[in-house]
């Protein structure tokens, strides 16, 4: 049996291993090549991983060393690193303390990303016209992990902004070798079911390896074939995937994605409907008010109140025309007499007598024709005038009253046209053709039919 004093504590063992790491000359300065992974720029010290096809090691680069790096680190970038291996006692993990770092070409994943991006761009898939999102969506599909924070953020935002929206979750694997096929399967399922106004596809943040399913060509082409607009929410705001380029809209966060598919909140929609209703009611009231004013003006117009004045001007025009016609005839007769006198002064004897007789006959004929023409023209004008007067007479309110009709006014002379204009115990006046009759309202009854 081993004595208890011979057992080491975890701390003691870790400290022993750290001393071994620090004392080993082969670990004091190592030269490595690998791809950067799990990198996110921070203020101060930088933490990331170096990996190849079979292994991965954590790396730390202190502020002073990192300040000498003249380029930006990127996910998947292949680099050459000089540093020392050390053990971190609190976690018992060994890691590389990077002292110098420089690029070594392009990382495999990043290179694959750039190649696919270039290929799809050449096909014009990034330049497609964005499909518009509806202002008032009814159904939206969400493709993401059922256990992540993405779906919770989306549900919370939709419940706050537009609670009548129906969200349908299509759970998918969003990380690992099976993720791309799972995403494509769910997208095809949404397309088959149909009836969705938009699709949100996304996941939370992670390394380029974690997000890689959203850079797969099969996923990109499945998104292109979707009949409805697609909103991408993959990773953090600084992450960019092929899915972001293909989607109609890109959202930096799941909350932003939910806001994009609900452009108008339910409260705003209800307020807009209320405002439109008020405007419609006001417009109807204004139209009815203007129509009532026009009717009142028409009822008070000269045509209805003094119809005789309508054809006064026509009587005057006929009289003026008759006077001008008579004056014209007299002028022509005087001119003919003058010509006759002039001709007589130039003739003598028998020739004068013969010429005079002929002229008298001509004058008599002209007088007769003028008289006939004047009578015919006057007759035609009188007939036209009589026809116009008859037409106006039929339109005269007095004529209508003469056929047994009547109209009713109140004490102020306002015409009462509808049952709603009458009040019980109201004094009214009934106007007939030759006068008016006073009356008193005792009952009101609406006719049906």
Swiss-Prot record:
Cytoplasm among keywords: yes
GO MF term (any one): nucleic acid binding
Domain of life: Bacteria
Keyword Cytoplasm: yes
InterPro entries membership: Exonuc_VII_L, Exonuc_VII_lsu_C, OB-fold_nuc-bd_dom
UniProt feature coiled coil, ranges: none
Cystine pairings recorded for this chain: none
Principal cellular location given in the protein's record: cytoplasm
Subunit structure of this chain's protein: Heterooligomer composed of large and small subunits.
Catalytic activity: Exonucleolytic cleavage in either 5'- to 3'- or 3'- to 5'-direction to yield nucleoside 5'-phosphates
A Pfam family this chain is assigned to: Exonuc_VII_L
GO biological process: DNA catabolic process
Keywords: Cytoplasm, Exonuclease, Hydrolase, Nuclease
Matches recorded under PANTHER family: EXODEOXYRIBONUCLEASE 7 LARGE SUBUNIT
EC number of the protein: 3.1.11.6
Compartment annotation: Cytoplasm
Family to which this protein belongs: Belongs to the XseA family.
Task performed by this protein: Bidirectionally degrades single-stranded DNA into large acid-insoluble oligonucleotides, which are then degraded further into small acid-soluble oligonucleotides.
Full protein name: Exodeoxyribonuclease 7 large subunit
GO cellular component terms given for this protein: cytoplasm; exodeoxyribonuclease VII complex
């Amino acid at each position: 049996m081993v004595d208890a004093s011979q057992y080491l504590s975890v701390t003691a063992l870790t400290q022993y291993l750290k001393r071994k790491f620090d004392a080993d000359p082969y670990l004091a300065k190592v030269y490595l090549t690998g791809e950067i992974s799990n990198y996110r720029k921070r203020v101060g010290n930088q933490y990331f991983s170096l990996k190849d096809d079979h292994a991965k090691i954590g790396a730390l680069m202190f502020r002073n060393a990192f300040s000498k790096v003249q380029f930006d680190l990127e996910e998947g970038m292949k680099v050459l690193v000089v540093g020392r291996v050390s053990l971190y006692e609190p976690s018992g993990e060994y890691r590389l303390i990077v002292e110098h770092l420089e690029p070594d070409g392009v990382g495999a994943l990043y290179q694959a990303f750039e190649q696919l991006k270039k290929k799809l761009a050449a096909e014009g898939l990034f330049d497609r016209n964005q499909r518009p999102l509806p202002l008032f969506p009814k159904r939206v599909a969400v493709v993401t992990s059922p256990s992540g924070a993405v779906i919770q953020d989306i549900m919370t935002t939709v419940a706050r902004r537009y609670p009548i929206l129906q969200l349908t979750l299509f759970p998918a694997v969003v990380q690992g070798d099976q993720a791309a096929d799972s995403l494509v399967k769910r997208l095809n399922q949404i397309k088959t079911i149909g009836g969705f106004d938009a699709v949100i596809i996304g996941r939370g943040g992670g390394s380029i390896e974690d997000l890689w399913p959203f850079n797969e060509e099969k996923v990109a082409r499945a998104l292109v074939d979707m009949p409805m607009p697609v909103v991408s929410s993959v990773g953090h705001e600084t992450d960019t995937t092929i899915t972001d380029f293909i989607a109609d809209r890109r959202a930096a966060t799941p909350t932003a994605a939910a806001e994009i598919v609900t452009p108008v909140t339910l409260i705003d929609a209800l307020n807009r409907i209320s405002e439109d209703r008020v405007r419609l009611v006001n417009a109807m009231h204004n139209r009815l008010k203007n129509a009532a004013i026009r009717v009142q003006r028409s009822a008070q117009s000269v045509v209805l109140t003094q119809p005789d004045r309508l054809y006064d001007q026509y009587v005057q025009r006929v009289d003026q025309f008759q006077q001008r016609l008579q004056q014209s005839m007299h002028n022509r007769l005087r001119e003919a007499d003058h010509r006759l006198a002039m001709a007589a002064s130039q003739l003598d004897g028998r020739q004068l007598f013969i010429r005079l007789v002929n002229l008298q006959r001509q004058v008599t004929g002209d007088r007769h024709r003028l008289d006939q023409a004047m009578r015919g023209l006057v007759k035609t004008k009188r007939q036209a005038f009589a026809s116009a007067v008859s037409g106006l007479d039929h339109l005269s309110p007095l004529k209508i009253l003469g056929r047994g009709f009547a109209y009713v006014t109140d004490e102020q002379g306002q015409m009462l046209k509808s049952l709603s204009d009458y009040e019980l115990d109201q004094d009214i006046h009934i106007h007939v053709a030759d006068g008016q009759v006073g009356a008193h309202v005792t009952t009101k009854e609406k006719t049906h039919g």
